[in-house]
Amino acid sequence: MTKRAIVLLSGGLDSATVLAMARAQGFETYALSMRYGQRHSSELEAARRVAAALGATRHEIIDLDLRRFGGSALTDDALAVPTDGASDGIPVTYVPARNTIMLSLALGWAEAVGGRDLFFGANAVDYSGYPDCRPEYVAAYETLANLATKAGVEGDRFRVHAPIIDMTKGEIIRAGIALGVDYSLTVSCYQADDDGRACGVCDSCRIRRAGFEAAGVPDPTRYQAAA
């Protein structure tokens, strides 16, 4: 019997690894990306490349303009993207309810195509300030999924997977390399240019670069300038 999984795919390093993990577990993968008004829209081109390279059965990009709400440095040009490392509290790069919105879209698609597994790249190590990247959030969303759907209330339960939630960036990279992920296809930078070249100074770039160093793997990231 075919097992189908919906995988949230941003085009970044973490979600590419999660897509490879879902495939390695024998799932037929359906990749879901969202054009939500993010600064770094070149990540969607990266998502297309990654979905093709990792053999996703389908890849859908949903338009939902969260820039109309603002509230995040990723969707509001008046808020600066931080470049000075981790800060106390919830980072300004947190997009209000983004994971909940995207998981809900994934849940609807999963029920429509007969999938019962949702995968996403939540990580509580690098992004410990994000409320929707915590283990208790993952557990709570799985409970919601099974309360809010026809399949769930009929006993055909959904499972929400966050396989990299406790992994360091170096561990994630090593796992992805073992599964054949080509990280040169990915874009992680919050301020990547239209060609997908990274700024080299934002927090996401800093974490990504440190991850490749920790993994002992050459960094394939293309930078806008020496950084």
UniProtKB/Swiss-Prot annotation:
Stated name of the protein: 7-cyano-7-deazaguanine synthase
- Kindly state which reaction or reactions the protein catalyses: 7-carboxy-7-deazaguanine + NH4(+) + ATP = 7-cyano-7-deazaguanine + ADP + phosphate + H2O + H(+)
List the Gene3D superfamilies hit by this protein, alphabetically.
HUPs
GO-annotated molecular function:
ATP binding; ligase activity, forming carbon-nitrogen bonds; zinc ion binding
Write the record's keywords in alphabetical order, separated by commas: ATP-binding, Ligase, Metal-binding, Nucleotide-binding, Queuosine biosynthesis, Zinc
| Cofactor binding notes | Binds 1 zinc ion per subunit.
Binding locations of ATP: L9, S10, G11, G12, L13, D14, S15, A16, T17, V18, L19
Write down the EC number.
6.3.4.20
The source's domain of life comes to: Bacteria
Q: What does this protein do?
A: Catalyzes the ATP-dependent conversion of 7-carboxy-7-deazaguanine (CDG) to 7-cyano-7-deazaguanine (preQ(0)).
CDD domains associated with the record: QueC-like
The protein's required cofactors: Zn(2+)
Any keyword Metal-binding? yes
What are the BP-aspect GO terms?
A: queuosine biosynthetic process
Q: Which residues bind Zn(2+)?
A: C189, C199, C202, C205
User: Gene that codes for this?
Assistant: queC
Entry similarity comment: Belongs to the QueC family.
Give the metabolic or biological pathway.
Answer: Purine metabolism; 7-cyano-7-deazaguanine biosynthesis
The record's Pfam families line, in alphabetical order, gives: QueC
